[in-house]
Amino acid sequence: KSYITDEQLSGWSPFPILELTEENPYYSTKDGCLLSKDGLVLVKYPSAISGTVHIPDGIETITSYAFILSEAEEIYFPDSLRVLMPKCFWLCNKLQKVDFGHGIEEIGIGHDCSLFMQCSMLHEIEIPPQVRIIGESAFLGTAISKVTFHEGLTQIMDYAFKQSCIKEVTLPASLKYIGRQSFPGMDSVTLLSDNMPYGIAEAITSNTIQDNSPIYIKIKKPAATVFMPRYIVTADAVTLDTRLAIPSFREKCEELLYDYGMQPEIKWKTAIKTMKECPNDTVKTYLRRVSKNIIAMYMELNDETGLIDFIKLGIMTPKALDDTYKKAKENGLTTVMAYICEAQKDTKGSNSSFSL
């Protein structure tokens, strides 16, 4: 007949059913679930119950650790549900599907809510249209590789999907704020608005370089596609987000995204990709200015494919091509030499039918 703390709940062994006497002043039971006395709060669900779980209608809150170590594979929320307390679905290693219902508007509350931490079988989720906010660390440390959002979502808080497996995401036009490190590791972001949500640079970039990861992130908007360096110093990412939020700065800032890369190679490769996919005079001028450095980089790496791709941009002068040919000869880069010879036959020095 005493109050049960969160720590006590987290340490409970698997139970197939929970029952209490009616005289208990704090709790009640229904369908084997431990509830608050008024039946509005789900305190503990029997973790030994497997398969599909339908949380009883009328429940408004699920407390911390309510489903810890649950054997459930699918969980369906009632439309009455409004609050998910931190860590309520921790370590649900068999959980594969969550249906959030039509009632809840905020997924996770408070600092570091970590709702689904280490749910290693949860690969895909859909956030329903009525949800406005996804809380801090809500899906931190999950196996999620695909998430679907709907219009109506306005905020995604810090670390919401950190340490997940998501590589591509589409963000609704209604999204106004996206917290830091909420989507690190992205390869591609599709925006349904030409205005980037505030915080996007801190949300998707990192200040720690990882091997075998692309240098840049593709951001597709309705009117244009841009490329942002994957690796940006944190202070520079904050500055970038501030500038992207100011309408009079935004267009020019997007043309200069490559310049925020934390290392010269990152800047150069992001600029090259930008010139290939969405050229503009700003990036063209920049690449001409640093072309000697770029050529030296590819020579040092013995990267003939990369160097030829750079030459194909058509921004090098005839003299620069001659100098590159000589350096390629010195380094034994025969494929580059052959390409330059073919390219120089074109009077414009840009278009060539030569293929590798």
Regions found by a protein language model. Name each.
Residues 346-350:
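Terminal, non-catalytic domain-edge segments
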